[in-house]
């Protein structure tokens, strides 16, 4: 299945000069959505993962069905102030400044094999901060999986030597 057939391209959104890749049409098509999830489930199975971690918000949309299919847990990564219990945090650089991500301090058990699942790999800041938190909690990075990678932004460099799977490249 050519998943790119289910990605909408919007020029100059959210601002001039940006080409936005919208996964909404993929999610709206049950066959395409299911196919994408199954591809990541197979990757996760091969990696023998114990836990899925997904950054808000679209990481939830992709990561939760993967965790469900595998019968394993899902840990959300959120912006500050969105999680109700004790959290750890990691900062990451954005185009104009620094932002912070958090996750529950008990989300990952030491030794758990963790797969990060998100919709998009762009600059890699989000995934780098997420890796930092997983490792701080003693998790073992099994890999990362993304629906889309924007190749020209070189986000893969922030993943380092960790394995990753991408379903579509732009």
From Swiss-Prot:
Domain of life: Bacteria
Alphabetical UniProt keywords: Cytoplasm, Glycosyltransferase, Purine salvage, Transferase
Gene3D superfamilies per the UniProt record, alphabetical: 3.40.50.2020
GO molecular function, one term: adenine binding
GO process terms (BP): adenine salvage; AMP salvage; purine ribonucleoside salvage
Record field: transmembrane: none
Gene Ontology cellular component list: cytoplasm
Annotated compartments: Cytoplasm
Enzyme class: transferase
Pathway assigned in UniProt: Purine metabolism; AMP biosynthesis via salvage pathway; AMP from adenine: step 1/1
Catalytic reaction(s) noted: AMP + diphosphate = 5-phospho-alpha-D-ribose 1-diphosphate + adenine
EC number(s) from the headed UniProt entry: 2.4.2.7
PANTHER family: ADENINE PHOSPHORIBOSYLTRANSFERASE (PTHR32315:SF3)
Function: Catalyzes a salvage reaction resulting in the formation of AMP, that is energically less costly than de novo synthesis.
Subunit description: Homodimer.
Family statement: Belongs to the purine/pyrimidine phosphoribosyltransferase family.
Record-given protein name: Adenine phosphoribosyltransferase
């Amino acid at each position: 299945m050519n998943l790119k057939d289910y990605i909408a391209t919007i020029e100059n959104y959210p601002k001039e000069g940006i080409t936005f890749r919208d996964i909404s049409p993929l999610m709206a098509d049950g066959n395409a959505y299911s196919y994408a999830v199954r591809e990541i489930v197979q990757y996760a199975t091969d990696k023998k993962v114990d836990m899925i971690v997904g950054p808000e918000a679209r990481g939830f949309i992709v990561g939760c069905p993967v965790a469900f299919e595998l019968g394993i847990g899902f840990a959300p990564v959120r912006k500050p102030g969105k999680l109700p219990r004790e959290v750890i945090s990691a900062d990451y650089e954005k185009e104009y400044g620094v932002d912070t991500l958090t996750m529950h301090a008990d989300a990952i058990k030491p030794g758990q094999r963790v797969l990060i699942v998100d919709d998009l790999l762009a600059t890699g800041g989000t995934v780098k901060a997420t890796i930092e938190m997983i490792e701080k909690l003693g998790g073992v990075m099994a890999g990362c999986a993304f629906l889309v990678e924007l190749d020209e932004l070189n986000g893969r460099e922030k993943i380092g030597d960790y394995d990753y799977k991408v379903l579509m490249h732009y």
